[in-house]
């Protein structure tokens, strides 16, 4: 079965104070849980600041990856270095999946792991078995990565809620955040929110197209 795997670690994790460590872990788990109505998804931490996520429906892997980064940035405490993660998405077959993610194996794990080994200063990369797909998605992923890395906490929260509750009006989401609609709209536009959502939808449709080939 083709699934998605996200391999990641926290950026500058040694700068995160001990009192915030559990909060960061909770943020990651809470974010992943938000997607359970769409797909089975499981997150497992290892080596303290590293983690892997398995996504049963691979078309949602990018949405989950962006949501993880958005949620981390949105929940960063005041006067702290912005929380973020480096994430490598791998899409492929997973013939063997054990109870523990880190002992599972398959194409998606290998693609994700190898990509993560070469992620360098990037914070989002995607690898699949399809060369044409990788070429089509690489440039727009670099652009999206640059946009996400520049988000403020408020911009990140606005995009995060818009991704999760696409059926809600901006006015309703603004009220949830105790913002005016104008303020919400300002953060949405400055975060390039619509472009990010379009990128996510493009990824979803492209993945499904290649899977069906």
Predicted ranges, named:
Residues 1-213:
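Regulatory and interdomain segments flanking nucleotide-handling catalytic cores
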């Amino acid at each position: 079965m083709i699934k998605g795997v996200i391999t990641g670690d926290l950026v500058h994790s040694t700068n995160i104070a001990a009192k915030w460590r559990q909060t960061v872990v909770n943020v990651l788990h809470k974010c992943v849980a938000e997607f359970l109505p769409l797909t089975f998804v499981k997150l497992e931490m290892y080596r303290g600041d590293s983690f892997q996520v398995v996504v049963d429906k691979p078309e949602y892997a990018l949405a989950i990856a962006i949501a993880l980064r958005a949620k981390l940035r949105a929940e960063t405490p005041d006067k702290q270095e912005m929380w973020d993660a480096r994430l490598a998405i791998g899409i492929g077959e997973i013939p063997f999946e054990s109870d523990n993610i880190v002992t599972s194996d398959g194409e998606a794990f290998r693609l994700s792991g190898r990509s993560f080994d070469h992620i360098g200063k990037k914070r989002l990369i995607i690898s699949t078995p399809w060369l044409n797909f990788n070429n089509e998605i690489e440039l727009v992923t670099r652009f999206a990565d640059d946009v996400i890395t520049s988000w403020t906490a408020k911009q990140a929260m606005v995009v995060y809620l818009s991704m999760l509750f696409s059926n809600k009006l901006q006015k309703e989401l603004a009220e949830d955040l105790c913002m005016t609609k104008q303020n919400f709209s300002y953060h949405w536009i400055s975060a390039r929110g619509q472009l990010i959502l379009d990128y996510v939808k493009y990824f979803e449709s492209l993945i499904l197209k290649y899977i069906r080939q």
